[in-house]
Structures are given as structure tokens and as C-alpha cells.
From Swiss-Prot:
Record-stated family: Belongs to the metallo-dependent hydrolases superfamily. Uronate isomerase family.
Keywords: Isomerase
NCBIfam families for this protein: PRK02925.1
Coiled-coil region list: none
Metabolic or biological pathway: Carbohydrate metabolism; pentose and glucuronate interconversion
Catalytic reaction equation(s): D-glucuronate = D-fructuronate; aldehydo-D-galacturonate = keto-D-tagaturonate
GO BP annotations, alphabetical order: D-galacturonate catabolic process; D-glucuronate catabolic process
Annotated protein name in UniProt: Uronate isomerase
Species this protein is from: Salmonella arizonae (strain ATCC BAA-731 / CDC346-86 / RSK2980)
Pfam families reported for this sequence: UxaC
Gene Ontology terms, MF aspect: glucuronate isomerase activity
InterPro entries assigned: Metal_Hydrolase, Uronate_isomerase
EC number: 5.3.1.12
Length: 470
């Protein structure tokens, strides 16, 4: 019987163990997409206790707590203490066997806290609370300290075009901190014309860009000013959350002006008008990214805020989203081609939330590759509900079968937690075990030099090269 979570966790043969311990584990982390707070990094936040750093804002854990029947007051309630929430989590963790949360919880205790020989649960919670809180009181366990312990080289936060990026500039000016914290442009509110808050958002964009927006060209000018601001602050990537992937041929500016005017007047748009406007903004943005050398990321297929009652109570991003099942292949093909036809398709990473679409994305990438950029269009790592063992394996295997795994830019945390860097470790163990199994089975050569290069490239080198501004 194999012991739970030894140093060789998930590594089933000697080849895998060599690849992980000798080559993957020492590589730095290039976390090009996350939801960390730049303010917390700028302020070098110190966490009061384990409950605070572990559970605050973590909707993965919140969903598990709700599934275990825990009262909402012990999940998000302001009337309960961090310790009470922590104990609710301690009572829930033994019930998560088979869920990636069980693995992540124990990996997070191992690194950075050094707790390697204790299962987390109600019987051990008090001891672990004390041990971890003692460490959290030291400088090595501040927000920056944890990032340094985990060998992070770069993080890409997720930022709205109206953001001042003051905290990014503060971090960049601090020579004592060697980790790059780059903003990522997330313009969802500027192209989702169908959303209730669209008109209010345009008002905020007007103020940030000092442009009065009444026509489509005004919107372009406002976004251009903000793109320039982001570029000046070190941005090299854009991200887009696309629940429903729409496409329609882009009409002329007069028609786009009419669509925008209807929306500003409070009139209802047709589905065609929504698709025309959305496509026009996304295609124009893609061309701007290409001109700047940025990477365009498309996260496709979530259904968000499913629970109206809880959305009214807690707002978005609180654990009430799930996997959508819209067809995406035709619209995605046309969207990418609309940029590529003028040779203005930027480097692009495609993510799907529905694993049914894995092969759709894996094959779509091959349609739009380009000379001089290895893996110009990427099939991104298992996202959200898929960043677990089976989901990561599916993505790696399907990418290898339909593209070039060797050119993959690898893992990202996509997380709001400073403890989630162990997801890179989880991914690296799964990657090394997959390659080790293939080599042991004679499906690929057992060539340490060849395999080690591939591992190190996927863990760090490919992403570092891919996100560089050339």
C-alpha cells in the first residue's frame, strides 16, 4: 500500500521521480494569470491567522462547506470569527476525500508551513492552528514572504481598464522586492453590452480616460488611452471571460454608433446587435494586443451567478458558478480568423470550462499558428473545475495528441490565495508522472536530457519566453 502524500506523491516510477525532483521542483513559478490583490502585495499584507489566509475569498472551499451542510454564517458571515470558520473547515476536510481540495489542503500545509506528517481534521485542527499562526506572525509568512518562499518569479494580476494601477507602480518602484507583478487587462465590462451595468460602466471609463463616449470611435479612443496606461505599467496580457461566445460580421461605424446609441438610450438590443457590437470590440482589441506584443487569453464557457438569492446576498465570485454547454467552435473560428485575415491575431491562449470542448480548442489552435512564435495559439491548462488530476491529465493528453505538448506554457493558479502556488507543484507532479509512464511503457524515449528539457520548458521557460514583449 502506498502511503498518503510522501515526497513521491503522484510519482509512480523512477523516471517520474527523477524528472520531478531533479528538474521540475527547482524551477521558478511564472504565474501569468491570477486574481491576487495587488494592494495586498504592495502593502505586504500580514495575515492574522490560518483561517484568514486559507478561507478568505476561496470559493472552492466555500462550495465544499456548503455541500457539507455548513451554515452560511460559518462560510462568509461577518458575525463569526476566523477561528469558527476555520473549525468548520476542519470538520469538512475529512469529507472531501476524492475531491482535489483534500490534496490541495495537505499540499498547502506542507508548503510553506512544513506540516508533513499530520492529516488535517477536527482532531488536529488546534495544533495546526497554533503552529501555522506562529509562522504567520513572522516576516517570512507575509504576502511577499510566501511568494518568495515559493520561488515565484512573476505574477499577472487581473485588472479592469479603469484601474489606476497605483499598486503595481508602487511594487515596481520597490527595489527590495524582486518578483514582477504585472497587470493584465480584463475589459469584460467594456464589450458585454447586454449587461445591466454597461451604461454605468461607460461612465466610469469616460472618467478614467477623459473621453466622452457617445459613438463607437469614442469607445475606441477611451480604450486606447487605457491600453497605453496599462502598457506603461508593464502589462503584457489581456484576459476575457466569455460566457456565451458570439460572432457576427463587424458592421461599419455608423451601424455600431446606432447600436451604442440605442443602448445608451435604454433601448433593448437584438441578439444580432449584441453579437455585432461584441465582435467589433473583441476584434479591435485583438488587433491592439497584436500591435503591442501582448497575449490574448479567452476563458470560455462559465455560467455565472446561477443562484439569484445568494447573488443578491453575497454578490459575484462567491461560489455559485458552473459549467456551460453552449456550442463554441464556429464562433471561435470566425473570431480568430477575423483577426488573422489581416495578420493581426495576437498570441492567444484558449481555455474551456466544459471538458467536452477540449478537442475543439486543441484542434482550433493548429489553424492559426504563425512563424517565429512557438505555440502562438495555445490550448490552456485545465481551468477552474478542471484544475484537478483528471482534468489536468485530459488537457495534457489531448494537447499532446493534437498539438505540441513541448511548446505548452504550463500551469497558472487563477487564484485569489497566496497559498495556492502548490497547484504548480500538483501540476508538475502530474506532468512528470505522465511523461515517466510514457517512457516506462516505451511510448517515448527514456532519454533524461530530452525529457528534462521538456519538463523545464513546460514548468517555466516556455511561459517566460511566450509572455516576453519582443
Amino acid at each position: 500500500m502506498t502511503t498518503f502524500m510522501t515526497k513521491d506523491f503522484l510519482l509512480k516510477n523512477d523516471i517520474a521521480r527523477t524528472l520531478y525532483h531533479k528538474y521540475a521542483a527547482p524551477m521558478p513559478i511564472y504565474d501569468f494569470h491570477c486574481h491576487l490583490s495587488p494592494q495586498e502585495i504592495a502593502d505586504d499584507r500580514r495575515f492574522d491567522n490560518l483561517g484568514q489566509i486559507w478561507l478568505e475569498g476561496d470559493h472552492y472551499k466555500w462550495r465544499a462547506l456548503r455541500s457539507a451542510g455548513v451554515d452560511e454564517s460559518l462560510i462568509t458571515g461577518k458575525e463569526t470569527s476566523d477561528y469558527e470558520k476555520y473549525m468548520a473547515w476542519a470538520n469538512t476536510v475529512p469529507k472531501t476525500l476524492g475531491n482535489p481540495l483534500y490534496h490541495w489542503t495537505h499540499l498547502e500545509l506542507r508548503r510553506p508551513f512544513g506540516i508533513t506528517d499530520t492529516l488535517f481534521g477536527p482532531d488536529t485542527a488546534e495544533s495546526i492552528w497554533t503552529q501555522c499562526n506562529e509562522k504567520l506572525a513572522t516576516p517570512a509568512f507575509s504576502a511577499r514572504g510566501i511568494m518568495q518562499q515559493m520561488n515565484v518569479r512573476m505574477v499577472g494580476t487581473t485588472d479592469d481598464p479603469i484601474d489606476s494601477l497605483a499598486y503595481h507602480r508602487q511594487i515596481a518602484a520597490d527595489d527590495s522586492f524582486g518578483i514582477e507583478v504585472a497587470p493584465s487587462w480584463r475589459p469584460d465590462k467594456a464589450f458585454k453590452i447586454e449587461l445591466d451595468g454597461f451604461v454605468d460602466y461607460l461612465g466610469k471609463l469616460e472618467a478614467a480616460a477623459d473621453v466622452n463616449i457617445t459613438r463607437f470611435d469614442d469607445l475606441r479612443r477611451a480604450l486606447t488611452r487605457r491600453l497605453d496606461h496599462f502598457a506603461a505599467c508593464g502589462c503584457r496580457a489581456a484576459d476575457h471571460g466569455i460566457e456565451t461566445l458570439r460572432f457576427a460580421p463587424v458592421p461599419d461605424d455608423a451601424q455600431l454608433d446606432a447600436i451604442l446609441g440605442k443602448r445608451l438610450a435604454g433601448e433593448t438590443l437584438s441578439e444580432l446587435e449584441i453579437a455585432q457590437f461584441t465582435t467589433a470590440v473583441l476584434v479591435w482589441l485583438g488587433r491592439q494586443y497584436a500591435a503591442r506584443g501582448w497575449v490574448m487569453q479567452l476563458h470560455i464557457g462559465a455560467i455565472r451567478n446561477n443562484n439569484t438569492r445568494m447573488f443578491r446576498l453575497l454578490g459575484p465570485d462567491t461560489g455559485f458558478d458552473s459549467i456551460g454547454d453552449n456550442n463554441i467552435s464556429w464562433a471561435l473560428s470566425r473570431l480568430l480568423d477575423s483577426m488573422d485575415v489581416t495578420n493581426e491575431l495576437p498570441k492567444t491562449i484558449l481555455y474551456c470550462l466544459n471538458p467536452r470542448d477540449n478537442e475543439v480548442l486543441a484542434t482550433m489552435t493548429g489553424n492559426f499558428q504563425g512563424p517565429g512564435i512557438a505555440g502562438k495559439v495555445q490550448f490552456g491548462s485545465g481551468w477552474w473545475f478542471n484544475d484537478q488530476k483528471d482534468g489536468m491529465l485530459r488537457q495534457l493528453e489531448q494537447l499532446s495528441q493534437m498539438g505540441l505538448l513541448s511548446q505548452f506554457v504550463g500551469m497558472l493558479t487563477d487564484s485569489r490565495s497566496f497559498l495556492s502556488y502548490t497547484r504548480h507543484e500538483y501540476f508538475r507532479r502530474i506532468l512528470c508522472n505522465l511523461l515517466g509512464q510514457w517512457a516506462q511503457d516505451g511510448e517515448i524515449p527514456d532519454d533524461e536530457a530530452m525529457l528534462s528539457r521538456m519538463v523545464q520548458d513546460i514548468c517555466f521557460n516556455n511561459a517566460q519566453h511566450y509572455f516576453a514583449i519582443k
